[in-house]
Amino acid sequence: MMIVGNGRLITRDPANPYLEDGAVVIEGELVKEVGTLAEMKAKYPNAEFVDAQGGVIMPGLINAHTHIYSGLARGLAIAGKNSRNFIEVLEDTWWNIDRHLTMDGTKACAYATVLDSIRNGVTTIVDHHASFGEIPGTLFTIKDVCKEIGIRANLCYEVSERDGEVKTAESIQENAEFARWAAAQNDDMISAMFGGHALFTISNKTFEKMVAENNGLTGFHIHVAEGLNDVYDSLNNHMCYPIERLERIGGILGEKTMLGHCIHLTDSELDTIKATGTMCVNNPESNMGNAVGCSPVLKMFQKGIHVCMGTDAYTHDMLESLKVFLIIQRHQNQMPNVGWCEGTDMLFKNNAKMMAKYCKKPLGILAPGAAADVCIYDYKPFTPFSDENIDGHMIFGMMGKNNRTTIINGKVVYKDREFVNIDEDAINAWTMEQSKKLWGELNNRVY
């Protein structure tokens, strides 16, 4: 048994949202009780104590859309590439990288992503992977890294026809095999969706194969209308809009399916998303960085669509994404009073509701029976801090880098900015060698 206390406790439980000197009692994989530190210490005198040292104690965060394959791209410049539009960004950088990823490259990307996520207080990742240099077994390799380090993960492989029929078939098979394996485990730490890249790189025939292989086992995780090219492809080649196309194919939209980006959609398409219970995930920084537009999240909320928040691997800091979401929505809508409730709902409520479709234990909340995913942030405010203004401090005062300790599924995996029972230096050294190998292949030089 463990007590995490001596800090400001944010529970995200509407019945008991905030305790000034709070504590969380953890037993096994679950939260057993929350209360004041004095109460919990008196009730459980023999419990191990994790001292928050006056910081902020809060539920671990969920990143609802990321890409492990980008894990070795930080600092990389590919010679001769100066991408002028979204398609060139994909062709010059991301598809170029994933074509060069072997199994070791994928493993190194997974280490980089998982370690940095945990450092930033992220306890659950929802990943959409691609490594067309080597496909079979990649999701199992990523799963092994997630289990080794201790992060909670929902994984899929992005099916795409961009590298030919053999790679397309392998990517479908990788999804199907991993989804069946994950379903058989009955393990809240690892789950699966069935991935697809985007409509403009997947034919109807391939979508039908994906639906058949999935056979209703899990939901789909697909990019939709991230760029206008996706819309034009559907209109020119299929005589309908992207969501109409998915609806006609059948078996894809639904309550366990999540669509990435969803920037260039019509009102009718949004109505279909709502009617089918399909989820969307917004990635504000990535959309701005790729210059593809701003997702109509306010309209989605007005229609009652379940919208989550991800990063698209632009960052692993969810609080950073929350800040940027607020700024871009206000800028885009030219209204300084919008986006606050939507952004905080996406990150702190909707991401957890999304994972509730794949995880039996409640996430994103510190209450009896919830998963013991807890973080401690070094944050000592110089203005009043209470349940009335928690999110104001989150948006304007806190960052992922404030995170000092991360507990996942009841285990301390990162304490006082050091990983527990993990040789981080050895992992970093090996990952560095893999990144040098990848960069060398991309730039035809030695690093």
Please tell me what each predicted stretch does.
Residues 7, 24, 29, 54, ...:
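Divalent metal-coordination and catalytic microenvironments
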Residues 72-106, 163-164, 228-254, 276-279, ...:
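Active-site gating loops and adjacent loop-to-helix segments of metal-dependent hydrolytic enzymes
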